[in-house]
Amino acid sequence: MAEVRKQQQFTRSVCVLDLGQKTYCGKVVRAVDGVYYTIKIGRTVQCGVTPTPIPKSYVLEIRECGRYRIQDGTDVLSLMITESGIEVTQNRWEEWSFEALTPVPMAVAVNVGRGSFDTEIKYVRGSGAVPPYTKNGMDRRAMPSLPGITTLDVGVRDLRLKMRENREAEREKMERALSGGLDMGSCRMYGGGRNDVREITLDEAGPSRTPRKLSVQSNESRSDDVARRHAELVEMERLRIMKNEPVRTESMWCQSDSDDQSDEDHEVGGTEPENYITEEYTRRLNEVKTKYSKELSSLAMRVPKNEGNCGKPIFSKKCKWENVPIYNYDEASGNYRFVSVGSRTHYHCCANDLSYMILPAGGSG
């Protein structure tokens, strides 16, 4: 049998300020020359007299005995204050009537001891409109007589179990009851009418369409595939440059209609220096791609040439990169030119059409 977990109750505090000193709280406070009758209720209950409200407490100002309920969101504190005593609970207490109170939060400084400190309290004022031990006008145990229904001689829990175990039979019983004397709108109002929906055959629906076969792939696996494909292409580019083989890298990285722009990038700069695409640079490209995948998701990565145009910078970041190609980059024109292999403390991410480049430029290492 599953263990029934008891709902956890948090400690709540209420400070009663009885200005008329007619209630039990006011009498106790006057006897010890205090100001507030304070109650902390949680795992234990602590009562006492304090000169100030305590931190994060409800301050209840009253002048008469009465029945007060402080309602603060999901927190409920019910107090029964008389001339001879006080009762407090955080649980349901529905057999009595209440004066419902909504607290107002206040930022205050509490002056106590040798100084003061800042805290928050919540203030409410009760008028005593509901005398102590006033019976609730509605008896929750009494069954009302309502037109159109007949009270069953079973409990609600037993009824729910029966409805759950005989779902189909109960559904048919309801449909039979609704089938006579009610129009479709009224049936739908009661939740019925489902059996009257006409089924459409395949012949009536028209010619069938061959469904496309869709492959379901998670965002995580798709991102891994893109990162792996980029890493492979960057490595291919590095090996090509080491062998000084002319290829059309633009069409490899960005499969678009920018063939003319791709040809121009390859013609600019002539012969490219060997080995300037280092393994360290390749690793850094993958790091940037992974870290800023959201910003770069719609762009394809390109490896810089000896010189060319890479467009305007999307963002510039600080870094500590060593053994990477260094470029002179003109932000106004977007032109760049390879200088040497070394270290840099800044890099630019530049975009042109549907692709981007990572240029270590600016800030010598």
From Swiss-Prot:
It holds the Pfam family BTV_NS2. InterPro entries: BTV_NS2, NS2_N. Keywords: RNA-binding. Residues 257-266 have a biased composition (Acidic residues). The keyword RNA-binding applies. One of its GO terms (molecular function) is RNA binding. Belongs to the orbivirus non-structural protein NS2 family. Single-stranded RNA-binding protein. This is Non-structural protein NS2. It comes from African horse sickness virus (AHSV).
